[in-house]
């Protein structure tokens, strides 16, 4: 075990009146106060700042170079956002993505394209499609790719932006379906655009087509498109179309689902998950939509607030309607895919490992000038598997794909470290810029049973972060921290008491001290999750330079941050355990820390064989 350094943590608050303890951790969702964008499709990628404009920080080349991730998906250069058309095809994983091939900011949006054998090491291919027709001159935006079961054609259906910024659907096809790399794509000018917004839908509120089911009986696809209806109650909606060829499409009556007061839905996804029986632990192809013991996850990205929500329910393919199991946690008002900087997620089925894999992009929160100086902007989050949580029966589990573990190198183990109230313990792990951390925590049981303080209405975003002291939290880890803890990113648990006396457990990310720069967005984000009787609190953290991803309780919830330290970089980055609770001692039962290898990220060597 490493030598410990214990020091008081600054920041405190007076104790509150309390309620009697009843039970541990029930699921709830917290609404964070965030800045909203008027339209994601014209987003600059620079983040939003409140109040007066801060002067730009004097970034050095050394600082900017450090920010580049080592094992997350990244472009070779320039701007990236939404993942599009992920798939496995003829021995290669493909990822298409929204991309500005010319500059490190939003604009000239095209489909970037990369391939991999393992979802970690990537070859970048030529841009698949560019905005060069009247029907997509403002941007080739998010869409999907489908392999036709009858003749093997590979069809791209995408959202195009006209010069008026109207959103319409167009088709491109792989020029050579026998090419495993799918390098060349051909737009079908004679039929494009194949779809326009239907009556009642705004001309700029119609995007992100995604197939959800193939009916083998009549060889038709059902696909969803996201939108909103402001003539109702700022209602987010998903419409269902049918098609046999992705050229002739028919709108079905009604909508797949709608929720009032949540605004525009984009990047809608609907997929099956096994809820019981022999398929548990496996991802399901969309052909399993009608299988027994299957639930259906509806996910949508909320354009008003830039977060991805989901709900679990049932899809009736005959009526093309989806119904949530619990309306109180419907799409847009309940469960989040991730509480932080993670957006526009899209899943695909991996037939090789029989799993459903989710991609989501992680944008910048620094200044646009800093991105230009770096020459790139944004990452994709680590690809995650998605499974139904059979233990709770109420949520999904998202977890880093198993291939990530192949990047682990030197490992340090720590066990039974007691972290006293108001103290920190440094974990001497060596290079702390690329890490995979697994930790389990146990709280003093006497404190749980005797604590009577109430944190009524506690949520991470308005709590004051890791410096705010309560009886039962916060406690967790500081990563990307400097030695004197004046710069750090905190990922932690906080146990609070509700009005009924029950205890709720929160996973939070505190970015407020993550950088000494002022021209970046810094927030505290997070939400609650379920902890069952007998479970230790578990946390996995992936640290990859300026991106930090945390997963609690096996993936019941997660949070992602972009951070831009000025001092806690290179050899000056540190890791600490901390406990800022006023009424409980915390024991880190087991902490495992691996230094992580980097992945390759290069242009495809076309002089070699495929």
Swiss-Prot record:
Pfam families: Glyco_hydro_32C, Glyco_hydro_32N. The active site is at residue 82. CDD domains: GH32_Fruct1-like. One of its GO terms (molecular function) is hydrolase activity, hydrolyzing O-glycosyl compounds. The chain crosses the membrane at residues 21-38. InterPro entries: ConA-like_dom_sf, Fructan_Metab_Enzymes, Glyco_hydro_32, Glyco_hydro_32_C, Glyco_hydro_32_N, Glyco_hydro_beta-prop_sf. Optimum pH is 5.5. Stable between pH 5.0-6.0. GO terms for cellular component: vacuolar membrane. It is an enzyme of class 2 (transferase). Residues 39-610 are vacuolar. Might be processed in two N-terminal and C-terminal proteolytic fragments. Substrate binds at residues 79-82, 98, 106, 141-142, 207-208, 266. GO terms for biological process: carbohydrate metabolic process. Involved in the synthesis of fructan of the inulin neoseries. Has no 1-FFT activity. This is 6(G)-fructosyltransferase. It comes from Asparagus officinalis (Garden asparagus).
């Amino acid at each position: 075990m490493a030598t410990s350094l214990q020091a008081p943590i600054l920041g405190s608050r007076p104790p509150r009146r309390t309620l009697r303890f009843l039970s541990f951790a029930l699921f709830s969702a917290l609404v964070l106060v965030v800045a909203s964008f008027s339209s994601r499709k014209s987003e600059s990628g620079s983040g939003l700042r409140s109040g007066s404009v801060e002067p730009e920080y004097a970034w050095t080349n050394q600082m900017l170079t450090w920010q580049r991730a080592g094992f997350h998906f990244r472009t070779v250069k320039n701007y990236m956002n939404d993942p599009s058309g992920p798939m496995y095809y003829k021995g290669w994983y493909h990822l298409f993505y929204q991309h500005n091939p010319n500059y490190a900011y939003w604009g000239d949006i095209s489909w970037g394209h990369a391939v991999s054998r393992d979802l970690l090491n990537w070859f970048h291919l030529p841009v698949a499609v560019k905005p060069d027709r009247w029907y997509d001159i403002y941007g080739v935006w998010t869409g999907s790719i489908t392999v036709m079961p009858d003749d093997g054609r590979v069809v791209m259906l995408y959202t195009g932006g006209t010069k008026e910024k109207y959103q319409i659907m167009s088709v491109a096809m792989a020029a050579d379906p026998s090419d495993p790399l799918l390098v060349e794509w051909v737009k079908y000018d004679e039929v494009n655009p194949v779809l326009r917004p239907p009556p009642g839908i705004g001309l700029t509120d119609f995007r992100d087509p995604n197939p959800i089911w193939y009916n083998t009986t009549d060889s038709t696809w059902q696909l969803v498109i996201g939108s909103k209806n402001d003539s109702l109650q700022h209602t987010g909606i998903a419409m269902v179309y049918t098609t046999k060829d992705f050229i002739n499409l028919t709108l079905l009556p009604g909508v797949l689902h709608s929720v009032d007061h949540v605004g525009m839905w984009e990047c809608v996804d609907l997929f099956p998950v096994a809820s019981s029986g022999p398929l548990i632990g496996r991802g399901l192809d969309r052909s399993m939509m009608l299988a027994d013991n299957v639930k259906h996850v509806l996910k949508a990205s909320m354009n008003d607030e830039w977060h991805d929500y989901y709900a679990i329910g049932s899809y009736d393919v005959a009526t093309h309607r989806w119904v949530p199991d619990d309306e109180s946690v419907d799409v847009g008002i309940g469960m989040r895919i991730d509480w932080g900087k993670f957006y526009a997620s899209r899943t695909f089925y991996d037939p090789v490992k029989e799993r459903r894999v989710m991609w989501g992009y992680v944008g910048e929160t620094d200044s646009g000038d800093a991105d230009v100086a770096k020459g790139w902007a944004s990452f994709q989050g680590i690809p995650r598997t998605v499974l139904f949580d059979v233990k709770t029966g109420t949520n999904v589990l998202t977890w880093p794909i198993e291939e990530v573990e192949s990047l682990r190198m030197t490992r340090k183990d720590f066990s039974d470290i007691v972290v006293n109230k108001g103290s920190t313990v440094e974990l001497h792990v060596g290079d702390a810029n690329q890490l995979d951390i697994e930790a389990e925590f146990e709280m003093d049981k006497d404190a749980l049973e005797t604590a009577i303080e109430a944190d009524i209405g506690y949520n991470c975003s308005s709590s004051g972060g890791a410096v705010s002291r309560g009886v039962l939290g916060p406690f967790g880890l500081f990563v990307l921290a400097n030695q004197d803890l004046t710069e750090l990113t905190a990922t932690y648990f906080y146990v609070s008491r509700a009005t009924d006396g029950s205890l709720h457990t929160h996973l939070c990310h505190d970015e407020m001290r993550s950088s000494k720069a002022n021209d970046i967005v810094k927030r505290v984000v997070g939400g609650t999750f379920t902890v069952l009787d007998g479970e230790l609190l578990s946390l996995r953290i992936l640290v990859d330079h300026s991106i930090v991803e945390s997963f609690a309780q096996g993936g019941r919830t997660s949070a992602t941050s972009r951070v831009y330290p000025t001092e806690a970089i290179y050899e000056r980055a540190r890791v600490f355990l901390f406990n800022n609770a006023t009424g409980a001692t915390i024991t880190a039962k087991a902490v495992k820390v691996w230094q992580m290898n980097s992945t390759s990220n290069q242009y495809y060597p076309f002089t070699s064989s495929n």
